[in-house]
C-alpha cells in the first residue's frame, strides 16, 4: 500500500467534511447531541470497519468522538484512509 504525499492528502481533504491532516493521520472530532448518540455512531463505524478490515483509532470524551485514520502497516495515510473517512462521513450523516 502506497503512502500518499502531503499534497495528495490535502487535495483529498477538499472533499471531506471537517477532517484535518494532523500528526501524520486524518482526524475528525464530532460533538453529538448526547453521549448515547456518540456511542451509536461509534458502533456503526466499528461494524463497518470490521467489514473493511481497516479500523480507525477512536477516542470518546463524553459527547465528543474523535476518529483517527492512518494505515499503521504502511506508516502513513493511504487511499484506504481516505475511503474510510468518506465512509465515516456517510455513516454519521454528514
Curated annotation (Swiss-Prot):
Q: List keywords of the entry alphabetically.
A: Lyase
Say if the entry is tagged with keyword Lyase: yes
Enzyme Commission code = 4.2.1.96
Pfam families under this entry?
Pterin_4a
Q: Which SUPFAM superfamilies match?
A: PCD-like
Listed under catalytic activity are: (4aS,6R)-4a-hydroxy-L-erythro-5,6,7,8-tetrahydrobiopterin = (6R)-L-erythro-6,7-dihydrobiopterin + H2O
| Keyword Lyase listed | yes
An individual GO BP term: tetrahydrobiopterin biosynthetic process
GO molecular function annotations of the record: 4-alpha-hydroxytetrahydrobiopterin dehydratase activity
Q: Which family does it belong to?
A: Belongs to the pterin-4-alpha-carbinolamine dehydratase family.
Record protein name field: Putative pterin-4-alpha-carbinolamine dehydratase
Query: What organism does the UniProt record list as the source?
Result: Mycobacterium leprae (strain TN)
Q: What is the lineage of its organism?
A: Bacteria, Bacillati, Actinomycetota, Actinomycetes, Mycobacteriales
Amino acid at each position: 500500500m502506497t503512502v500518499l504525499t502531503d499534497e495528495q492528502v490535502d487535495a483529498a481533504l477538499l472533499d471531506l467534511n471537517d477532517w484535518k491532516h494532523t500528526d501524520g493521520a486524518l482526524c475528525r472530532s464530532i460533538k453529538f447531541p448526547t453521549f448515547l448518540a456518540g456511542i451509536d455512531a461509534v458502533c456503526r463505524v466499528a461494524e463497518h470497519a470490521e467489514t473493511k478490515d481497516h479500523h480507525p483509532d477512536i477516542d470518546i470524551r463524553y459527547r465528543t468522538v474523535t476518529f483517527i485514520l492512518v494505515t499503521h502497516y504502511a506508516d502513513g495515510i493511504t487511499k484506504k484512509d481516505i475511503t474510510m473517512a468518506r465512509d465515516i462521513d456517510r455513516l454519521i450523516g454528514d
